[in-house]
Amino acid sequence: MGVKKEKGRKRFRKRKTFGNQILPLELLIEKNKREIINSAELMEEIYMKIDEKHTQCVTK
């Protein structure tokens, strides 16, 4: 008869962690459309960011 091999300690596979990923602006806007539309302050912030990006692209 064969001898049973001793099983070692099971090791858990680490889940892949993706740090704090920054979602692209467009995706954020898609996810939070209702909140943004209802909030004038958020709308202003987004327009400011879009303007900043646009001016950066134009100057490059």
Curated annotation (Swiss-Prot):
Alphabetized GO MF terms: DNA binding
Q: Note the InterPro entries from the entry.
A: SenN/SenS
What keywords would UniProt list here? DNA-binding, Transcription, Transcription regulation
**Key word Transcription regulation present:** yes
Query: Any idea which residues the entry calls the DNA-binding region?
Result: 11-31
Q: Where is the signal peptide?
A: none
Q: Which domain of life is it from?
A: Bacteria
The family line of this record is: To B.subtilis SenS.
What job does the chain carry out? Regulates the expression of extracellular-protein genes of Bacillus natto.
Q: What is the recorded name of this protein?
A: Transcriptional regulatory protein SenN
The record lists the lineage as: Bacteria, Bacillati, Bacillota, Bacilli, Bacillales
